[in-house]
Regions:
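PLP-dependent aminotransferase class I/II
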Residues: 1-141
Length: 141
């Protein structure tokens, strides 16, 4: 029943999430032009459902500092994934395990920011805290 109610409101939910995603994307454009982060790339003629918003920071040290400082400011963020090839089960079950430079690099740099349909009233605060955090990192890392 709960999921059915969400399905019935899917268009409204997606519209609101996309609006929040676009707010992030616009707000962080200046930081991308300064080389502080990279924003998501959505190819032309493609749509997305805004299920998450991520940024790529220059390296693991910056990502760790970013997440720690953002948390100290009351905003949670998470890294996205541990690459499957580096998981313990990969040693046992995978056809490949070992070094995958590009995959490892992205997993060390990617940060997911808060994004859910009820974020409307807090999105400006999150943007401000991310901006403050990036400024802090310029001085600290």
């Amino acid at each position: 029943a709960f999921l059915w109610a969400q399905m019935e409101a899917a268009d409204e939910i997606n519209t609101r999430r996309i609006a929040l995603w676009n707010r992030y994307n616009s707000a962080f454009e200046k930081f991308e032009s300064q080389g502080k982060l990279r924003r998501p790339i959505v190819p032309e003629r493609c749509d997305h459902n805004a299920h998450m918003y991520y940024i790529l920071l220059p390296n693991l040290k910056k990502r760790t500092g970013f997440m720690d400082y953002l948390k100290s400011q009351g905003v949670g963020s998470v890294f996205h994934y541990v690459p499957l090839h580096s998981a313990p089960a990969a040693q046992k079950f995978s056809r490949y395990h070992g070094v995958m430079d590009i995959t490892d690099q992205y997993s060390e740099r990617l940060v997911r920011l808060p994004l859910w349909v009820g974020l409307d009233s807090d999105v400006d605060m999150v943007i401000a805290k991310v901006s403050d955090t990036l400024s802090y990192l310029d001085n600290d890392c």
